[in-house]
């Protein structure tokens, strides 16, 4: 009987450990990942971004405390695992480590879909939710949102102006849609009406949150550009889908794909 008890204890110990461990997220991108991967009872607190529907995806923080990334605010949470971008807050991370806090770095490391999937899988193991994340990864890998357009050169504009596609979410978004960046890259420095017309984009993607103003984005209202895109594919998605390189990019691609079906 005693032996049976010991075996059962050993079997359920890992489950108890996962259930009792809690996590604190201190940045927008870790908020989004934690909300998707962890169970609600595993989340102890999140950043203020977690309550903003313009920045989060479909899972908002409605009942968890929000914390600023400050040492004094985190002192009551030193027994939790802290998800933080070390490059944003190097001094805070150093101070927390001196106090023995458990840090799980969520930096802007992934640059490809496979690297992102590896991070998601790691967080799934960390939280004991491997089955869920494997299902999520399989869903993302199987998503087919290619637009099958013959002309694919794409201009992406956001509320903050021209999108420079060196951050991984934009090349990934284009790849998911079967689109390509402009052959003549436009940057914030060389962006102008003349340069846009010369680049002859075949597709326009607008990314906005309807809260910002930018002179470059305002160029879209120019009659010449209005005429250029009058009979060309023109899509719009909220900015929340590209704030972070995470599963939101796939959601954004799916939203554009659905728009293409009714154009």
Regions found by a protein language model. Give the residues of each.
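Basic- and aromatic-lined ligand-binding clefts that recognize polyanionic substrates
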Residues: 21-37, 129-178
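A short, structured surface patch at a secondary-structure boundary
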Residues: 22-87
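Structured C-terminal subdomain patch of bacterial secreted/periplasmic proteins
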Residues: 26, 114-125, 134, 147, ...
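Short helices/loops that flank or line small-molecule/ion binding pockets
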Residues: 70-79, 98-99, 192-200
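Short beta-strand->loop
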Residues: 84-86, 105-112, 155-165, 238
């Amino acid at each position: 009987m005693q032996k049976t008890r010991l075996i059962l204890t050993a079997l359920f110990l890992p489950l108890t450990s996962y259930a009792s461990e809690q996590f604190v997220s201190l940045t927008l991108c870790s908020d989004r990942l934690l909300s998707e991967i962890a169970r609600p009872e595993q989340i102890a607190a999140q950043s203020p971004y977690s309550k903003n529907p313009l920045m989060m995806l479909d899972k908002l923080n409605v009942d968890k405390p929000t914390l600023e990334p400050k040492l004094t605010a985190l002192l009551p949470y030193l027994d939790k695992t802290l998800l933080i971008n070390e490059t944003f807050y190097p001094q805070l991370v150093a101070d927390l480590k001196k106090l023995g806090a458990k840090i799980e770095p969520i930096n802007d490391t992934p640059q490809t879909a496979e690297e992102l999937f590896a991070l998601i899988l790691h967080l799934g193991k960390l939280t004991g939710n491997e089955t869920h994340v494997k299902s999520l990864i399989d869903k993302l890998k199987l998503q087919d949102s290619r637009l099958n357009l013959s002309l694919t050169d794409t201009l992406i504009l956001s509320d903050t102006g021209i999108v420079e596609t060196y951050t991984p979410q934009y090349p990934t978004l284009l790849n998911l849609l079967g689109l390509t960046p402009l052959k003549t890259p436009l940057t914030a420095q060389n962006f102008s009406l003349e340069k846009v017309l010369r680049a002859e984009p075949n597709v326009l993607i607008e990314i906005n949150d309807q809260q910002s103003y930018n002179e470059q984005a305002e160029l879209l209202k120019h009659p010449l550009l209005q005429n250029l895109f009058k009979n060309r594919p023109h899509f719009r998605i909220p900015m929340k889908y590209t704030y972070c390189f995470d599963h939101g990019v796939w959601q954004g691609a799916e939203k554009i794909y659905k728009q293409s079906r009714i154009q």
